[in-house]
Amino acid sequence: VTGNQNKVAEAHGILSPLGFVIEQLLIGGQVPDLIEPQAEGIEEVAKSKLDQAVSLTMGTEFENEALLVEDSGLFIDSLSGFPGPYSSFVHETIGLSGVLSLMSGETDRGAEFRAVAAVSFQGNILSSTGICRGVISENISGDFGFGFDPIFIPDEANGRTCAQLSSHEKSTISHRGFALKGVSELLNPPSK
């Protein structure tokens, strides 16, 4: 459940080959407007979004469908985990250049993306966490991806930012990819 087409495409690319059908939830032709709580952790944000989505689908054709939500954040070591669960707000307000300004002169550029994917299915809630370690780059670089991808260099990316990776390369090492694959294993996907 998201209005972010990039997240829908990424989930589709990761879960469809595993036998899952991924569709963006539309109620009355509209993406549900979920309130993003300001919480201390991405787990709480994902659970809140999932609870809202389940409530919105009660009494609709989607009431018995599996619902997937994902929340993620960028956690920068030298900034005590900032922006963390406030990543969307920080991206919208100070953007990539603002984060790079906060990191100006900083030698400890370690960071990680964390994601939580949560599914409501047949009355059960299943969740999985994914982490991708790396560093914050010195400059904005790359044309692919979204969010903080142009300033995050995963450890496994040979010096390239997430925004310089193909969608396939990114999905094999990304926090979201790990979280989504973890949920798929919990769901025991249908046979192909």
Regions of interest found by a model, annotated:
Residues 5-191:
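Anionic-ligand binding patches
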